[in-house]
Structure formats: C-alpha cells, structure tokens
Amino acid sequence: MSLPVLSRIRPAVAALSCLVLLTGSVYAQALENLSIATQGGQRQTFRVEVARNDADRAQGLMFRRSMPADQGMLFDFGRVEPVSMWMQNTYLPLDMLFIRADGTIARIAANTEPLSTRTIPSGEPVLSVLELNAGTAAKLGIKPGDRVEHPLFKR
C-alpha cells in the first residue's frame, strides 16, 4: 500500500474508532441497586440503568444483543399515568414489570416478543416499568403485588 493511500485511510480509521467508543459509552450508564421483595419473603437484587428522560426512555434496550442476568432497565415516567411499551428494535425477549407509585408491581408482561410493534399496556396508571431478561420473573417467583425497592419509590 502506498503512502498516499495510508494517509487517506488513517483519518477514516480514527473517525471510525471514535464512533465505536462513543456508541459504546451510550450503554455505559451508571447502574443503580434495585431490590424486589416478594410476598413469599424472598429478596431479589438487580443492578439497573434508569431511563429518566424522553431520549433514554425512547432508546430503552433497543439494539442490545445481551444483558447480564442480574441487570435491567427501570423507566421513570416522572408521574403516575397509563403507559404502553413496545419491542421495536429490541432484540432481547423481556419481562416488563409495571410498577405503581408505592413500588408494588401492578402487572407483569412476561416473555415479550422481540422486534414486535404491538403495544403492551400497563393496565392501570403506573410510575415506572422495570425490564428484565425474559423468564426472570417466573424463575425468581416475582408476581404482581410484590414490592420494588428503589429511591424512585420514596418520593
């Protein structure tokens, strides 16, 4: 490869490297502790990303190919209201836990279909939604009525 070709490629490689680094940082949000106290007396702890603004809520877990079993995403809607979720551009099957302002789980949409544009309603007004890997709620015995513990529910 001649020197003029190398001099043209080098800036492109540098730009591509920066893009990869910036894209990776989108997923490097700080993780927060969240626990679920089941009615059976068990406590399950997760590390969650919290989506607090419109941009983060719109992005959600889109385009991700994996998520550790002990992690999830908590969507903070900022007020109690009926919400609907969907799985557009989301490759991971998920359990969606719809959570009331007092931290109790109102509804669980289990094993949602990846890439679906079908809406998944909360069924009642909620403050937030917790997304976990599909099957997690059933495996850990998490059910409606269980209590989610996180600073969001201590407002």
Place the predicted regions along the sequence by residue.
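Bacterial N-terminal signal peptides that target proteins for export
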Residues: 2-15
